Amino acid sequence: MKKAMALLLGFCVLLCSVGALAEPRADLVFTSATISLSSSGTCTFRATTYDEKNRIEITTVYLFKKTNGVWECICSLPRPTYVSSGFIYNAVMNYGDYMGDGMYRVQAMFNADGHEAYRYSNGVDF
């Protein structure tokens, strides 16, 4: 009986120690990846990664316009040419010339050594 109890206790300790190692993450590569769009059309792209990367970049950028309550992709935009390495990516582009009257947001694909993540900016009225 003591042997079975000791074995059960050891198994419980093992399960607890394995569970403590698990880290819940929404994304396995990016700590954060954000796009901020200002009322002047300036778009700031920021990303950080959990581990050091050889290449962090933006691969695609799209402009969305809200029409009758629905976001519609209206065109692709020039992507930032900046490529970083390490843990941090920061780039700024101005897309004001692509926006008329209405509410707009930007979608971009962040890429870190082949791992991709889509993100959307905040919506801004022009």
Regions found by a protein language model. Name each.
Residues 1-4, 8:
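Positively charged n-region of N-terminal signal peptides that target proteins for export
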Residues 8-16:
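Bacterial N-terminal signal peptides
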Residues 15-31:
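Sec-dependent signal peptide cleavage junction
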Residues 39-45:
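Structural beta-strand segments of beta-rich domains
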Residues 51-57, 101, 116:
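A short beta-turn/strand-edge loop motif at beta-sheet boundaries
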Residues 60-61, 70-86:
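Solvent-exposed serine/threonine-rich low-complexity stretches and specific carbohydrate-binding patches
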Residues 93-103:
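Surface-exposed, short loops/turns at beta-strand junctions within beta-sandwich domains
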Residues 114-126:
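Short beta-strand elements
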